[in-house]
Design a protein with these regions (language model features):
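Conserved catalytic core of the tyrosine transesterase superfamily
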Residues: 1-274
Length: 274
């Protein structure tokens, strides 16, 4: 499990334990379904997002299930609590024209501009997570054959094709990049250190403004756009799932809903009875 996920689950349990302590409960077996329901209700009152509350309940379920299996707890209480209803939120997606404007925003006459353009091109070409992008090593990319090897969530390795535009952008960047023998990462800051997720997030926000893109944009939006545009042009859902590194095709199916939404808008705009 990823470190960020572990930290989130730990934080969920600490928060619930603090609530139980305030209620005078001395151990986990004193917790009843109503305790959990009241806690989740209080979290809503604190304006916690529905997705956050749902994750907190999942954390409790995992904890109790493990405790019961290990004989440390008597009852699996959280399984009696109904999950919050999550609204289906479609991913933010750029149009192909917006992607073109975004990828053209970096200044190709500067080293940082060449780096940023290569990162943007690669992100859109492969649908990588930004955490995977910044960790890429030079040995992970085969520019001659046009593919890369990436280690994603759960230490699962996958092979992803890389298009000619992204390959050329990477070549242009590497031709001007100052060599830092100690660094194997592809994308380095001007100080010779690996680019960070936050650093790149700030850069993409800057380029979105320069490209006059009004949507709320993040590196993940390019991942969403990669998947949606593939499906819109007829790509097989299972192939897209493999390239994204999704363990279940159900996760990938959300992009078909985006496609249907796009079709509905097109029909409404252009059909005489739309």
């Amino acid at each position: 499990m990823a470190r960020n996920s572990c930290e989130a689950y730990r934080s969920d349990l600490v928060g619930f334990a603090a609530y139980c302590e305030k209620q005078g409960l001395k151990n986990w077996d004193e917790v009843g379904p109503e305790t959990i329901t009241d806690y989740l209700g209080e979290r809503y009152e604190d304006r916690a997002a529905v997705a956050t509350v749902a994750r907190e309940l999942i954390s409790l379920r995992m904890f109790y299930r493990f405790g019961v299996e290990e004989g440390c707890l008597k009852n699996d209480v959280p399984k009696l609590v109904e999950s919050p209803k999550l609204a289906k939120v479609l991913p933010h997606v750029l149009t192909e024209e917006e992607v073109t404007r975004l990828l053209g925003a970096p200044d190709k006459d500067t080293p940082s501009g060449l780096r940023d353009r290569a990162m943007l091109e690669l992100l859109y070409a492969t649908g990588l997570r930004v955490s995977e992008l910044v960790k890429l090593k030079k040995g992970d990319i085969n520019l001659e054959e046009g593919f890369l090897q990436v280690t994603g969530k759960g230490n699962k390795t996958r092979i992803v094709p890389v298009g000619s535009y992204a390959c050329q952008a990477i070549r242009d960047y590497l031709a001007t990049r100052c060599e830092e023998p100690r660094r194997k990462e592809v994308f380095l800051s001007r100080l010779g250190k690996p680019m960070t997720r936050i650093n790149f997030w700030m850069r993409i926000k800057k380029y979105a403004l320069e490209a006059d893109i009004q949507k709320d944009i993040s590196p993940h939006v390019l991942r969403h756009s990669f998947a949606t545009h593939l499906i819109m042009h007829g790509a097989d859902l299972r192939v897209v799932q493999e390239m994204l590194g999704h363990s279940s095709v159900t996760t990938t199916e959300k992009y078909t809903h985006v496609e249907y939404s796009h079709l509905k808008k097109t029909h409404k705009k252009f059909h005489p009875h739309g």
